[in-house]
Swiss-Prot record:
Pathway: Protein modification; protein lipoylation via endogenous pathway; protein N(6)-(lipoyl)lysine from octanoyl-[acyl-carrier-protein]: step 2/2. [4Fe-4S] cluster 1 binds at residues 45, 50, 56, 285. It is found in: Cytoplasm. SMART domains: Elp3. This is Lipoyl synthase. It comes from Novosphingobium aromaticivorans (strain ATCC 700278 / DSM 12444 / CCUG 56034 / CIP 105152 / NBRC 16084 / F199).
Amino acid sequence: MTNPAETARPERQRKPDWIRVKAPTSKGYGETRALMRELGLNTVCEEAACPNIGECWTKKHATVMILGDVCTRACAFCNVKTGMPRAVDPMEPINVATAAAKMGLEHIVITSVDRDDLPDGGAGHFVKVIKALRELTPNTTIEILTPDFRNKMEAAVESIVEAGPDVYNHNLETVPRLYPTIRPGARYYASLRLLEQVKRHDPRIFTKSGVMLGLGEERLEVHQVMDDMRSAQIDFLTMGQYLQPTPKHAKVIEFVTPKAFDAYGSIARAKGFLQVAASPLTRSSYHAGEDFRQMRQAREAQLAKAAQKA
């Protein structure tokens, strides 16, 4: 007879107090949710079960997820549905721009699912969204968070860079050693090359990348990722705690303390990043508008200092 203790599903680690957030209830949260529903837009805030959704939506900040809500990849950390996606919505670019205008956004973050089924990986749709935003709400700064455009990267990145986003984000997610289990459909060095290519095409565009901690990475491996990012001229590093969305996803190996995040942040700044966000609740688009303004100021100060020395 089987022992029930042997077949019971292992318990997930209990979240420490520093990772807990209040359930969203504010008026602003409700208004943001209603507008997304009205325009038929998906958000990564909901699809990825982001812990900051209450705070961000209360402030009417949202990260719009284009190209549908079904991904062609199955990463071990991600809560977005996997399968065969539906056809691309031709009205999505104008709907995204309409949402940005109605919310009065100074800064918008656009991300997407992976669309390996599309000939260009969805790059053309990113371009249409950027153009619609520039036309309808020209004062809104635009940050994009793209997939890796596997086997289509060069043409995809070139077309998006030509559309002129203000920030190009692509997350490395974790250290190279963990890619086979955590991000099996991607390649670490291909993601680095993507970000290098953005800078080659247009050095004025800010580049950004992020990693999750708590998946079993070693401290020196994280330092090496920072060095790799700086070699690729990445301007902005985000670091946050990985949280297991469901029991089917990769387990949390460690809850990294706020003090440890502070230490990583200090090291990253010493390595030369223009901007660093490192805390348990940091996510790619968390406080993105405020961080963008600080990063732009840091670059201006850097250029002014260089001009004085010349």
